């Protein structure tokens, strides 16, 4: 793990809990190491507000020297392969690179090269594959509220098939002892996730859930036919967190969403800032979770020692 952070499920439970603990220390202001002379590059082939900005904020807080590369102005537009881009950046002196790419598993060919022939690698999202930094900040947010994972019930609702968040979170939550269930349109279910939890109707046992994790409808990944058939009102009625559904939730349940939020689609607009919502807390936690990720690549001994 010392040279890559590409899949949250590559971490042992001890590494994961230590990283969450360090993120909480960063948030409390108790522990801010200064990273001298390290250079990190950010290369996002897909649009991003929260992930891109919070990685840059994390880099600033840690003292990294930062470079932002616009792929539309890079040699990728001339046909340069991702491998050659990475080798070029390593040769120039980039220590770590944060990449978001539409290609699922873009990082697979580079595991052995990371930190040697190419920079150390951070996956900021790969197609509908993994979103490990989002998973870490989500776990951090759950720990802040519940202090533990074992025995919790998490309902993931929405566009499951196209969501890297659903895939990342379902596997790691299941491993940590959480009971995971999924709800959403039948055509957006992903049978490969049934090993981590069952698909149920949205209203089944909704009042027994500890965490409601809503997912954005990813129109950019839908077919033209799917987008034409989609109606906001119908989706909100069938799968959205409406006021009626909100009133059924447990008193200590929390609402989460990786954002961007489509108000009055996945969730009633008034509920985005409700008492149960942790949506903006997730965004805040994203900075500290990503600080822990970057720090684990620069000073891995700190991660192995924190929380023991």
Curated annotation (Swiss-Prot):
Residue numbers binding L-aspartate: 78, 164, 216
Q: Which Gene3D superfamilies match?
A: Aspartate/ornithine carbamoyltransferase
The record, for InterPro entries, names:
Asp/Orn_carbamoyltranf_P-bd (IPR006132), Asp/Orn_carbamoylTrfase (IPR006130), Asp/Orn_carbamoylTrfase_sf (IPR036901), Asp_carbamoyltransf (IPR002082), Asp_carbamoyltransf_Asp/Orn-bd (IPR006131)
Keyword Transferase part of the UniProt annotation: yes
Which keywords describe this protein according to UniProt? Pyrimidine biosynthesis, Transferase
The protein's superkingdom reads Bacteria
| GO MF | amino acid binding; aspartate carbamoyltransferase activity
User: GO:BP terms for this protein?
Assistant: 'de novo' pyrimidine nucleobase biosynthetic process; 'de novo' UMP biosynthetic process; amino acid metabolic process
Query: Which EC class is this protein assigned?
Result: transferase
E.C. code: 2.1.3.2
| Biochemical pathway | Pyrimidine metabolism; UMP biosynthesis via de novo pathway; (S)-dihydroorotate from bicarbonate: step 2/3
Binding positions for carbamoyl phosphate?
A: 50-51, 100, 131, 134, 259-260
Any idea what job this protein has? Answer: Catalyzes the condensation of carbamoyl phosphate and aspartate to form carbamoyl aspartate and inorganic phosphate, the committed step in the de novo pyrimidine nucleotide biosynthesis pathway.
Q: Which PANTHER family match?
A: ASPARTATE CARBAMOYLTRANSFERASE, ORNITHINE CARBAMOYLTRANSFERASE, MITOCHONDRIAL
- Stored NCBIfam families: asp_carb_tr, PRK00856.1
State how it assembles: Heterododecamer (2C3:3R2) of six catalytic PyrB chains organized as two trimers (C3), and six regulatory PyrI chains organized as three dimers (R2).
Recorded family membership: Belongs to the aspartate/ornithine carbamoyltransferase superfamily. ATCase family.
Its recorded name reads: Aspartate carbamoyltransferase catalytic subunit
């Amino acid at each position: 793990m010392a040279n890559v952070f590409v899949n949250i499920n590559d971490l042992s439970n001890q590494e994961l809990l230590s990283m969450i603990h360090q993120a909480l220390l960063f948030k409390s202001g108790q522990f801010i190491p200064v990273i001298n002379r390290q250079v990190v590059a950010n290369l996002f082939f897909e649009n991003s507000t929260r992930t891109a900005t919070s990685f840059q904020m994390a880099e600033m807080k840690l003292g990294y020297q930062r470079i932002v590369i616009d792929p539309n102005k890079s040699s990728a537009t001339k046909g340069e392969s991702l491998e050659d881009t990475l080798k070029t950046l390593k040769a120039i002196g980039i220590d770590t690179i944060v990449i978001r790419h539409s290609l699922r598993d873009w990082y697979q060919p580079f595991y052995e090269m990371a930190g040697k022939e190419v920079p150390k690698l951070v996956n900021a999202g790969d197609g509908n594959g993994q979103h490990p930094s989002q998973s870490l900040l989500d776990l951090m947010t759950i720990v802040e509220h519940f202090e533990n994972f074992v025995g919790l019930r998490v309902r993931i609702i929405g566009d499951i098939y196209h969501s890297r968040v659903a895939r990342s979170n379902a596997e790691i939550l299941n491993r940590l002892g959480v009971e995971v269930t999924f709800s959403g349109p039948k055509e957006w279910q992903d049978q490969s996730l049934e090993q981590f939890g069952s698909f149920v109707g949205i209203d089944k046992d909704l009042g027994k859930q500890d965490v409601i994790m809503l997912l954005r409808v990813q129109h950019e990944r839908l077919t033209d036919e799917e987008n034409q058939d989609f109606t906001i009102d119908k989706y909100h009625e069938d799968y959205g967190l409406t006021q009626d559904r909100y009133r059924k939730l447990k008193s200590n349940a929390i609402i989460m969403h990786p954002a961007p939020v489509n108000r009055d689609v996945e969730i009633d607009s008034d509920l985005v800032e409700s008492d149960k919502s942790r949506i903006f807390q997730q965004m805040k936690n994203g900075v500290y979770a990503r600080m822990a990720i970057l720090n684990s690549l620069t000073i891995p001994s700190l991660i192995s020692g924190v929380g023991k």
